[in-house]
Amino acid sequence: MYLTKEEEKILDGEYGEVLRRCMNLLVSLGDIYGADKLIPISSAQISGVSYKTIKDIGLEFLEDFAKEDVKVKVYATLNPAGMDLDIWRELGIDEKFAKKQLRIIEAFKKMEVEISCTCTPYLTGNLPRFGEHISWAESSAVSFANSVLGAKTNREGGPSALAAAIIGKTPYYGYHLDENRKTTHIIELDGQLISNFKYGESFYGALGYLVGKIVKNGIPYFENLYKLNPNNDNLKSLGAAMAASGGIALYHAKNLTAECRVKEVVNDKIEKISIGVEEIKEAYEKLNTTNEEPDLICIGCPHCSLMEIKKIAELLKNKKLNADLWVCCSLHIKAIADRMGYTKIIEKAGGKVVKDTCMVVSPIEDLGYKRVATNSGKAAVYLPSFCKSEVIFGDIEELLKGR
C-alpha cells in the first residue's frame, strides 16, 4: 500500500500515539481489502455512540482518544445515542446509564465531532455530493448516501469511521471503486403487486427485508419500483431494511437513484428475481411476531423526516393514545416540529417526540417494554435480538388506530 511521506510520519508516531493508532487501523484495513492508497474524504458519520452497544470498553477507548486533544479533520457527525440527551429522566433512563452516556458524548465533543446524534445526517447538514468519497458507518445512512445521493462509502465500523475523520482519509477499496458498484441482482415487482398496490409506507420495509434476505451483501437493481412513485422517506426505509436483513450497502433503482442511468451489471448471467403479493405477505407475517397489543409504539428508525412527523401529528389530532408513543428524530428536525406545532399535538395525544436516540439503541427493555409496534423493517429485524421485544409491524395508520 502506497503511503505519502506525511502518512508514513503519522504511522511512525511522529504526530502522537492517537494519530498513529488511527493511521495503523486505516492501513491495516487497506492491507486486508487490497487498497493501493488512502484517499481524502469530505465527511464522516460515526457509529458506536450508545452506551448500550459499546459498554465500558468503548467509553474507555473514546476517552483515551479525547484526552490527547485530537480533533477531527473533516465534518463529522454522530449516530444516535442511547437516550434523549435532554429528557432522559422523563423517559425513565437509569442515572448510571445516563452518566456514562454523557461521558461518551463529552469525549466526542472534545474531538469536535458534531453532537447531532442522528442516523439521517443527510437531513441535518451532512449532505455529500454525487461522487464524493466519504466514510460513514450507520448502515441505513451508508445505503442512502451510496444509492440515493451517489456518494461513495464503505460500510464502516465506528472505530474506522472515527479514524478516517481524524486522519481525513480512508483506504481506496470497495464501494469507492466504480467497478465494485455494479448490479449483482435484478429485482422486478410483479405486475399484480403494482396494479393492485394496497400498502402504505411499511411496504418498503417489508420489501427491503425480503430483498436483503435474498441478495445478502450484493447490489440489487430495482427494475420497476419507480412505478410506485416512492419518495425519499420510502427509499430511506427500503435501504435501512435491506442493510438490516442482509448486508446491502448500495442499491440501484431505475429512474430513482443517482447511478441508475448506467445499468452496469456484473455479468450476462445475472440473477433476476420476481417479487409478488405472496412474497410481500410472507414478509409481513415474518416481521410480526405477536398478535397482542403493544405497550410501546415507536416510529423513526431511521429517524423521522419533518413530513413523517407532520403525518403522525395529523393522525393524532384530537385523539388519545392507550400505548406509549416515541417519535424518534434528530435535534434539527425536532426544533422545526416544535415550531410547526406538531410536537404539541403528539404530546397532547400522549406521545413523545424523542431526539438523539431510537428504540433499537436505547435500553427500552430496562424500561419494561416487551411488545413494540413499528413501521420500520429495520427495527422489526433488530428489536427481538437487541431489545428482547416482540414486534407488531405495519403502517403508521394501523399502529395508531384505536390505540
UniProtKB/Swiss-Prot annotation:
Keyword Metal-binding: yes
GO molecular function: 4 iron, 4 sulfur cluster binding; lyase activity; metal ion binding
Binding site for [4Fe-4S] cluster: 119, 301, 358
Function: Component of a hydro-lyase that catalyzes the dehydration of mevalonate 5-phosphate (MVA5P) to form trans-anhydromevalonate 5-phosphate (tAHMP). Involved in the archaeal mevalonate (MVA) pathway, which provides fundamental precursors for isoprenoid biosynthesis, such as isopentenyl diphosphate (IPP) and dimethylallyl diphosphate (DMAPP).
Similarity comment: Belongs to the AcnX type II large subunit family.
Subunit-structure text: Heterodimer composed of a large subunit (PMDh-L) and a small subunit (PMDh-S).
Name this protein carries in UniProt: Phosphomevalonate dehydratase large subunit
